[in-house]
């Protein structure tokens, strides 16, 4: 069975590069009816935090990237790592090393001064050193000294590294804790991982890990190293370019569907297709079409995709996110139109759900403020008479008539004729009075969504405050 994994370290937030790796791994497993494993690599006890673990789990849940089976934590597997280390020592494939920090520092300085490759010189490799109680030591993996480590990377092609370039790396620290490169191999063997899709910053770790696989007589999985994501300027994507924490995108009003659709196309292609449902992603995804070159993050394209999903999604699919953003504003959504109806009207005018909530606030809050420029431009000496006539005409409508935007639009037109002015001389001041600004959806729709009571109350208030 095809089995992939996403294995983040909980030392910070879940960034978009990690999300893309998780997405590719998840899609490949789903495409092949396989399993997707989530593993928290928390062996860095000083830097790992529960807050970061929670951020990772929240991000994966928000995006809908559900793992199969339990979530694995490396800190709960220390006994297993120690067991394998002892097996390697017993088989002569690892050894105890008593070299002090001072000796290793002197060795490094000597190598640098003489333009030699830095790394451990193997002093304890064949010394058969057995640590005595109280002595400080580490355990090193006995890396092959000859030959070449080669693998066919699913993205980068054939890669070969001479074993002369690799030293005997530490697999157990002096405090007894196992190291990253060792733990991931044991985990991937025990979890039957067949395909490892990860960032290409791990390429240098791969030959070391392959040698451990071979020492443990295990099958070496397929590696697919995905290029990094760059900012729009070609530099490595960072905070200075904008949000990199995936949950910040939620706070900024982006839909998870838009994030996933954008990231799947960031370094992977399926013809000219731009818009993908989750089902379409799963069906089309493969490793062969991952681009070997870095991709630039285009914030404008992400915004375009987000607008598409706000406009085109079924309301049920985005309702949770819409309600989340309205809740953040403190607006009482029971004091206004149905959100489903509102989104259908406002979607064309916004790029994010933050914009949606902000630009729709006047539908739910009676505490509207008037835009000074709009008042100056549209409220004139004659506006009071127009408002009086509008109130008279609106009051004459029954509840059923108020549900028809065309009827309401015609009332505005009729009022313009009665006052012998153009439609704009009525519609624009009316907008200012009922929304606070000169911008809103079609005036008939705006009036319907606000409802008769709000419109009459706001017109009355505007008549008193703006038409003195």
UniProtKB/Swiss-Prot annotation:
Would you kindly state one Gene Ontology biological process term found in this protein's UniProt entry? glutamyl-tRNA aminoacylation
* UniProt entry tagged with the keyword Transferase: no
CDD domains, alphabetically?
GluRS_core
InterPro entries, alphabetized:
aa-tRNA-synth_I_cd-bd (IPR045462), aa-tRNA-synth_I_codon-bd_sub2 (IPR020751), aa-tRNA-synth_I_CS (IPR001412), aa_tRNA-synth_I_cd-bd_sf (IPR008925), Glu-tRNA-ligase_bac/mito (IPR004527), Glu/Gln-tRNA-synth (IPR000924), Glu/Gln-tRNA-synth_Ib_cat-dom (IPR020058), GluQ/Sye (IPR049940)
Task: Look up the record and report any one GO term of the cellular component aspect.
Answer: cytosol
The family database entries (SUPFAM superfamilies) matched by this protein are listed as: An anticodon-binding domain of class I aminoacyl-tRNA synthetases, Nucleotidylyl transferase
What are this entry's molecular-function GO terms? ATP binding; glutamate-tRNA ligase activity; tRNA binding; zinc ion binding
Location, primary (coarse class): cytoplasm
- Motif 'HIGH' region is found at 8-18
Tell me which PROSITE patterns the record gives.
AA_TRNA_LIGASE_I
Q: What cofactors are annotated for this protein?
A: Zn(2+)
Manner of cofactor binding, per the entry note: Binds 1 zinc ion per subunit.
Swiss-Prot/TrEMBL keywords = Aminoacyl-tRNA synthetase, ATP-binding, Cytoplasm, Ligase, Metal-binding, Nucleotide-binding, Protein biosynthesis, Zinc
User: Which positions does UniProt annotate for Zn(2+) binding?
Assistant: 97, 99, 124, 126
- UniProt keyword annotation of Signal present: no
Q: Which PANTHER family match?
A: GLUTAMATE--TRNA LIGASE (PTHR43311), GLUTAMATE--TRNA LIGASE, MITOCHONDRIAL-RELATED (PTHR43311:SF2)
HAMAP family xrefs = Glu_tRNA_synth_type1
- Family indicated by similarity: Belongs to the class-I aminoacyl-tRNA synthetase family. Glutamate--tRNA ligase type 1 subfamily.
What exactly does this protein do? Catalyzes the attachment of glutamate to tRNA(Glu) in a two-step reaction: glutamate is first activated by ATP to form Glu-AMP and then transferred to the acceptor end of tRNA(Glu).
The protein, known as: Glutamate--tRNA ligase
Name of encoding gene:
gltX
């Amino acid at each position: 069975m095809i089995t992939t994994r996403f294995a983040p370290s909980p030392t910070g937030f879940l960034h978009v590069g990690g999300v893309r790796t998780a997405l590719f791994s998840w899609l490949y497993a789903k495409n092949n009816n396989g399993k997707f494993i989530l593993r928290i690599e928390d062996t860095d006890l000083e830097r790992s935090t529960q807050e970061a673990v929670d951020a990772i789990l929240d991000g994966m849940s928000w995006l809908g990237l559900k793992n199969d089976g339990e979530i694995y934590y490396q800190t709960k597997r220390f006994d297993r790592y120690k067991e394998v280390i002892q097996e390697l020592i017993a088989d002569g494939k690892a050894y105890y090393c008593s070299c002090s920090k001072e000796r290793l520092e002197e060795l490094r300085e000597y190598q640098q001064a003489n333009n030699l490759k830095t790394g451990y010189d193997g002093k304890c490799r064949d010394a058969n050193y057995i640590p005595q109680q109280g002595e400080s030591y580490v355990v090193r993996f006995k890396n092959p000294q000859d030959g070449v480590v080669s693998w066919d990377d699913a993205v980068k092609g054939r890669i070969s590294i001479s074993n002369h370039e690799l030293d005997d790396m530490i697999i157990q620290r002096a405090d007894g804790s196992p190291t990253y490169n060792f733990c991931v191999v044991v985990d991937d063997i025990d979890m039957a991982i067949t395909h490892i899709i990860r960032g290409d910053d791990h390429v240098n770790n791969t030959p070391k890990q392959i040698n451990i696989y071979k020492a443990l007589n295990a099958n070496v999985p397929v590696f697919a190293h995905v290029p990094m994501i760059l900012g729009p300027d070609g530099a490595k994507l960072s905070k200075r370019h904008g949000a990199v924490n995936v949950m910040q995108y939620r706070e900024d009003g982006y839909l998870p569907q838009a994030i996933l659709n954008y990231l799947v196309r960031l370094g992977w292609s399926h013809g000219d297709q731009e818009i993908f449902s989750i089902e379409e992603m799963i069906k089309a995804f493969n490793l062969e079409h991952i681009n070997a070159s870095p991709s630039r993050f285009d914030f404008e394209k992400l915004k375009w995709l987000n607008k598409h999903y706000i406009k085109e999604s079924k309301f049920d699919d985005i309702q949770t996110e819409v309600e989340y953003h309205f809740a953040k504003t403190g607006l009482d959504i029971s004091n206004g139109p149905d959100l489903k109806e509102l989104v259908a009207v406002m979607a064309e005018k916004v790029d994010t759900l933050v914009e949606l909530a902000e630009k729709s606030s006047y539908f739910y809050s009676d505490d509207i403020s008037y835009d000074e420029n709009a008042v100056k431009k549209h409220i004139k000496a004659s506006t009071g008479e127009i408002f009086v006539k509008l109130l008279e005409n609106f009051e004459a409508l029954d509840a059923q008539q108020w549900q028809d935007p065309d009827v309401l639009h015609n009332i505005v037109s009729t009022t313009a004729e009665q006052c012998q002015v153009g439609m704009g001389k009525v519609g624009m001041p009316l907008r200012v009075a009922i929304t606070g600004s000169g911008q809103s959806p079609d005036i008939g729709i705006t009036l319907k969504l606000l409802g008769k009571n709000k419109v009459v109350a706001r017109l009355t208030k505007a008549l008193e405050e703006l038409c003195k």
